């Protein structure tokens, strides 16, 4: 019942933010025939999630410990290699967000990074290898930041 209620609310929110090519049937992202999305919709959802400071802070942590209602604590390790300075895929300025893998969807990541006040989000889905997902994320982020620098507005200079 809780899973159904979550999915119903998630689908409503997705439509509200313009993620109209998705349908969610569970909160964990595992395969279900009626659970699907697109890279474009995931970008919209990621942008929405980053509006919430508590989520933004959680996404960038390498480890999070929560106290659950029973009083027990649970620790979650973030598998985002872009956040780990000792990993070859470390990305300076990485801020999160979410990794995933299923046989059906392949290796996926929503990767965010911020440099010089500019935040970029890259969405990779359907990767054939875990390392490939990280290499693609780094390449997309590097290219996006380089493109932004090339096209960033400059200070106007008076005409002679």
State where each predicted segment sits:
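Penicillin-recognizing serine hydrolase domain
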Residues: 1-159
């Amino acid at each position: 019942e809780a899973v159904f209620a979550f999915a119903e609310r998630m689908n409503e929110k997705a439509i509200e933010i313009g993620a109209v090519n998705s349908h969610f049937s569970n909160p964990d992202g595992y395969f279900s025939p009626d659970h699907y999305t697109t890279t474009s919709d995931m970008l919209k959802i990621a942008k929405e999630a980053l509006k919430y400071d508590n989520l933004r802070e959680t996404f960038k942590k390498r480890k999070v410990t929560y106290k659950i209602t029973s009083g027990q604590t649970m620790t979650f390790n973030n598998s985002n290699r872009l956040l780990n300075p000792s990993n070859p895929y470390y990305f300076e300025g990485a801020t999160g967000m979410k990794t995933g893998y299923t046989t059906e969807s392949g290796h996926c990541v929503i990767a965010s990074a911020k440099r010089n006040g500019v935040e970029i989000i890259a969405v990779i889905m359907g990767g054939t290898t875990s390392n490939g997902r990280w290499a693609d994320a780094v390449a997309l982020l590097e290219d996006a930041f380089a493109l932004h620098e090339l096209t960033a507005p400059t200070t106007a200079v008076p005409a002679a």
